[in-house]
């Protein structure tokens, strides 16, 4: 058994799709647009099984997202931080609780906490 995907119910599908593809750098593995029902995209890094599914329901739908953090490992946390600043995403400062660990947080369009971490 392995972790397959995390679903994020989004209020603004296009804004979330842009965040996860242009900022995070994920690829769209599957896209579905069912008029009067929903839009859905399955996103992952090239060649990876674990995915993030973003869904927007056309009918009223509420979801509570407090307490959720999604973490991405990256090879250059400073570059990701600069990209977040350049895109106006207002990231936290880079934190380094020990010399081999560096991370920061940014919120996605639905205010889900996204962490980017680099371990040397």
Task: Give the ranges of each region predicted by the language model.
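Short hydrophobic/aromatic beta-strand element in the GNAT-like acyltransferase core
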Residues: 40, 71, 103-104
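Vicinal oxygen chelate
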Residues: 31, 81-120
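Short, charged/polar surface micro-motifs in flexible loops or helix N-caps
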Residues: 46-50, 60-61, 77-78
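N-terminal beta-strand motif that seeds the catalytic metal site of vicinal oxygen chelate
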Residues: 1-17, 68-70, 120
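Short amphipathic alpha-helices within nucleic acid-binding modules
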Residues: 19, 78-83
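Helix N-cap motif at beta-to-alpha junctions
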Residues: 12-13, 74-78
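Core segments of cupin and vicinal oxygen chelate
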Residues: 7-49
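Short glycine-enriched loop/turn motifs at secondary-structure junctions
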Residues: 1-2, 62-67, 97-98
């Amino acid at each position: 058994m392995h972790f397959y995907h995390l679903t994020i119910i989004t209020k603004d599908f296009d804004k979330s799709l842009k965040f996860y593809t242009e900022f995070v750098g994920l690829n769209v593995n599957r896209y579905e647009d069912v008029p009067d029902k929903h839009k859905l995209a399955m996103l992952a890094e090239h060649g990876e099984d674990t995915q993030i599914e973003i869904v927007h329901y056309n009918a009223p739908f509420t979801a509570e997202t407090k307490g959720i953090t999604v973490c991405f490992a990256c090879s250059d946390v400073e570059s990701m931080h600069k990209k977040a600043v350049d895109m106006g995403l207002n990231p936290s400062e880079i934190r380094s609780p020990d010399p081999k660990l560096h991370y920061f947080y940014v919120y996605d369009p639905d205010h889900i906490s996204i962490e980017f971490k680099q371990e040397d």
